[in-house]
Amino acid sequence: MLSPKKVKYRKKQRGRLSGEAQKGNKISFGEYGLVSLETNFITARQIEAARIAMTRKIKRGGRVWIRIFPDIPYTKKPAETRMGKGKGGVDHWNAPVKLGTVMFEMAGVVEELAQEAMSLASSKLPVKTMFVVRRDLR
Protein backbone atom coordinates (compact mmCIF):
# COMPACT_ATOMS: atom_id res chain seq x y z
CA MET A 1 0.00 0.00 0.00
CA LEU A 2 1.03 3.58 -0.56
CA SER A 3 2.39 5.66 2.31
CA PRO A 4 5.07 8.33 2.70
CA LYS A 5 8.61 7.16 3.46
CA LYS A 6 9.35 10.16 5.65
CA VAL A 7 7.21 13.02 6.98
CA LYS A 8 8.15 16.22 8.80
CA TYR A 9 5.37 15.77 11.38
CA ARG A 10 4.02 12.36 12.37
CA LYS A 11 0.51 13.54 13.29
CA LYS A 12 -1.72 16.18 11.75
CA GLN A 13 -5.05 17.83 12.47
CA ARG A 14 -7.94 16.53 10.36
CA GLY A 15 -9.04 19.69 8.58
CA ARG A 16 -11.72 19.94 5.89
CA LEU A 17 -11.61 19.90 2.11
CA SER A 18 -13.49 22.46 0.06
CA GLY A 19 -13.55 23.87 -3.43
CA GLU A 20 -12.52 22.45 -6.78
CA ALA A 21 -9.14 21.06 -7.82
CA GLN A 22 -6.81 23.73 -9.19
CA LYS A 23 -3.98 21.26 -9.85
CA GLY A 24 -4.16 17.67 -11.06
CA ASN A 25 -7.37 18.28 -12.99
CA LYS A 26 -6.07 17.48 -16.49
CA ILE A 27 -4.99 14.19 -18.06
CA SER A 28 -1.19 14.28 -18.21
CA PHE A 29 0.08 10.77 -18.97
CA GLY A 30 -2.58 8.47 -20.45
CA GLU A 31 -5.46 8.57 -22.91
CA TYR A 32 -8.28 7.95 -20.41
CA GLY A 33 -8.91 9.20 -16.90
CA LEU A 34 -11.13 8.77 -13.86
CA VAL A 35 -12.22 12.16 -12.52
CA SER A 36 -13.74 12.80 -9.08
CA LEU A 37 -17.17 14.46 -8.99
CA GLU A 38 -17.08 14.88 -5.20
CA THR A 39 -14.65 16.04 -2.53
CA ASN A 40 -13.48 13.47 0.02
CA PHE A 41 -10.48 11.71 1.54
CA ILE A 42 -9.51 8.38 -0.05
CA THR A 43 -7.53 5.84 1.96
CA ALA A 44 -4.45 3.98 0.76
CA ARG A 45 -6.44 0.71 0.89
CA GLN A 46 -9.14 2.12 -1.39
CA ILE A 47 -6.52 3.32 -3.88
CA GLU A 48 -4.88 -0.12 -3.87
CA ALA A 49 -8.24 -1.91 -4.30
CA ALA A 50 -9.06 0.32 -7.29
CA ARG A 51 -5.60 -0.27 -8.81
CA ILE A 52 -5.93 -4.06 -8.49
CA ALA A 53 -9.44 -4.00 -10.01
CA MET A 54 -8.20 -2.02 -13.03
CA THR A 55 -5.02 -3.99 -13.65
CA ARG A 56 -6.84 -7.33 -13.43
CA LYS A 57 -9.41 -6.14 -15.97
CA ILE A 58 -6.91 -4.86 -18.55
CA LYS A 59 -4.55 -7.83 -17.93
CA ARG A 60 -1.18 -7.10 -19.58
CA GLY A 61 -2.55 -4.79 -22.23
CA GLY A 62 -2.15 -1.26 -20.97
CA ARG A 63 -0.55 1.01 -18.42
CA VAL A 64 -2.15 2.58 -15.33
CA TRP A 65 -1.02 5.76 -13.56
CA ILE A 66 -2.12 6.63 -10.02
CA ARG A 67 -2.32 10.43 -9.81
CA ILE A 68 -3.18 10.73 -6.09
CA PHE A 69 -0.98 9.89 -3.12
CA PRO A 70 -2.02 9.27 0.50
CA ASP A 71 0.17 11.66 2.48
CA ILE A 72 -2.27 12.79 5.21
CA PRO A 73 -2.02 10.75 8.45
CA TYR A 74 -5.29 9.64 10.09
CA THR A 75 -4.93 8.96 13.81
CA LYS A 76 -7.16 6.82 15.98
CA LYS A 77 -7.23 5.94 19.67
CA PRO A 78 -7.68 2.29 20.66
CA ALA A 79 -11.21 0.99 21.35
CA GLU A 80 -12.57 1.42 24.89
CA THR A 81 -9.90 3.95 25.84
CA ARG A 82 -10.66 6.83 28.19
CA MET A 83 -10.34 10.35 26.85
CA GLY A 84 -7.09 12.22 27.33
CA LYS A 85 -3.57 10.74 27.41
CA GLY A 86 -2.66 12.37 24.12
CA LYS A 87 -3.51 11.92 20.47
CA GLY A 88 -3.80 8.35 19.17
CA GLY A 89 -1.35 6.65 16.85
CA VAL A 90 -1.49 6.84 13.04
CA ASP A 91 -4.12 4.35 11.86
CA HIS A 92 -3.87 4.86 8.09
CA TRP A 93 -2.99 7.39 5.38
CA ASN A 94 -5.46 9.44 3.33
CA ALA A 95 -5.24 11.19 -0.03
CA PRO A 96 -7.20 14.45 -0.32
CA VAL A 97 -9.37 14.42 -3.46
CA LYS A 98 -11.24 17.51 -4.56
CA LEU A 99 -13.97 17.85 -7.18
CA GLY A 100 -12.38 17.57 -10.63
CA THR A 101 -9.22 15.72 -9.57
CA VAL A 102 -7.92 13.14 -12.08
CA MET A 103 -7.31 10.13 -9.81
CA PHE A 104 -6.27 7.45 -12.30
CA GLU A 105 -5.09 7.45 -15.90
CA MET A 106 -4.83 4.63 -18.41
CA ALA A 107 -3.31 4.09 -21.86
CA GLY A 108 -2.63 1.27 -24.30
CA VAL A 109 -6.12 -0.28 -24.31
CA VAL A 110 -9.30 0.25 -26.33
CA GLU A 111 -11.81 2.75 -24.95
CA GLU A 112 -14.50 0.16 -24.08
CA LEU A 113 -12.07 -1.90 -22.00
CA ALA A 114 -10.73 1.23 -20.30
CA GLN A 115 -14.27 2.32 -19.42
CA GLU A 116 -15.09 -1.11 -17.94
CA ALA A 117 -11.87 -1.13 -15.90
CA MET A 118 -12.45 2.40 -14.61
CA SER A 119 -16.04 1.46 -13.71
CA LEU A 120 -14.74 -1.44 -11.59
CA ALA A 121 -12.26 0.90 -9.91
CA SER A 122 -14.97 3.49 -9.31
CA SER A 123 -17.02 0.99 -7.31
CA LYS A 124 -14.12 0.68 -4.84
CA LEU A 125 -13.98 4.43 -4.16
CA PRO A 126 -16.11 6.58 -1.79
CA VAL A 127 -16.65 9.35 -4.37
CA LYS A 128 -18.77 9.66 -7.51
CA THR A 129 -16.58 9.57 -10.59
CA MET A 130 -16.68 10.23 -14.32
CA PHE A 131 -14.76 8.51 -17.12
CA VAL A 132 -13.02 11.01 -19.41
CA VAL A 133 -11.06 10.71 -22.64
CA ARG A 134 -8.14 13.04 -23.34
CA ARG A 135 -9.93 14.64 -26.31
CA ASP A 136 -12.80 15.65 -23.97
CA LEU A 137 -10.59 17.89 -21.85
CA ARG A 138 -8.91 19.90 -24.61
From Swiss-Prot:
Protein name: Large ribosomal subunit protein uL16
Summary of the function given for this chain in its UniProt record: Binds 23S rRNA and is also seen to make contacts with the A and possibly P site tRNAs.
Gene: rplP
Source organism phylogeny: Bacteria, Pseudomonadati, Spirochaetota, Spirochaetia, Spirochaetales
Disulfide bonding pattern of the chain: none
GO cellular component terms, A-Z: cytosolic large ribosomal subunit
SUPFAM superfamilies: Ribosomal protein L16p/L10e (SSF54686)
Assembly notes: Part of the 50S ribosomal subunit.
Example GO biological process: translation
Xref: InterPro entries: Ribosomal_uL16, Ribosomal_uL16_bact-type, Ribosomal_uL16_CS, Ribosomal_uL16_dom, Ribosomal_uL16_sf
UniProt region (Disordered), positions on chain: 1-21
Similarity remark: Belongs to the universal ribosomal protein uL16 family.
Keywords: Ribonucleoprotein, Ribosomal protein, RNA-binding, rRNA-binding, tRNA-binding
One Gene Ontology term of the molecular function aspect: tRNA binding
Listed transmembrane segments: none
Extent of Basic residues compositional bias: 1-15
Keyword RNA-binding: yes
